[in-house]
């Protein structure tokens, strides 16, 4: 029995002691060297990116995403500290259907946050240069390939639903209370715990219909460029106390607190970011243009028609 315990201890020690990549370089290959070991990380379609709203193309043909079985209540999920973040497994009965009808089966979701040196913002995607407080990635694989392992290296193999977070000083989000309370059970890499009575839809923002979308990659090695990203416009709110707890609860492979676990934004490289909604500035510009055109129609047509009649009349003579 003691021998078995020793083997198990060595196994978990190995998990904690080794990681082949990291964000800072303190434990494994740092972000600036990822491309040396993982060539795709230096590719032309990398994620995350800064979404510049003035350059976003409105595509009215993009339908709202269909999140099937996300609303199922009181399910159980396995939550794991993988040494980089907290990951929660999702069942294959949940899937995302995109605007063109492609079905992507759910795999898992995980978080990215800040916290180091009092840095509260830790999202990966930024909007007009602004980094949000946190970001969650709901990872899905294309049903066409059967399994995640088959899909992860294939064209159009993956789809990720990105959820941004904002902070409210005191407004606790009770839908996240169980997840945050369970963090103490997975302090070290390799540890798992079970979430009970959880409804995934409650973890998303109220509005899941409006989104930005673009072709990109995984944001961690191997940075495979086969991901269609869907970044929701609406955000989830957490209290400051909840965010601070998340930032200071779990350890990495070097027994350091996991903080600032996000990748820097990558060059857009002429990719088109689309949205299925008009932003406020676009709506204002469109409305202003509409009013100007209406004003022209009201003031000018009568004079023009009269002039044309007169010309026609005199031409007969």
UniProtKB/Swiss-Prot annotation:
Cystine pairings recorded for this chain: 41-223
Any GO BP: detection of chemical stimulus involved in sensory perception of bitter taste
Bilayer-spanning residue ranges: none
Binding site for Zn(2+): 110, 112, 137
Alphabetical keyword list: Disulfide bond, Glycoprotein, Lyase, Metal-binding, Secreted, Signal, Zinc
Function per UniProt: Reversible hydration of carbon dioxide. Its role in saliva is unknown.
Protein name according to UniProt: Carbonic anhydrase 6
Gene that encodes it: Ca6
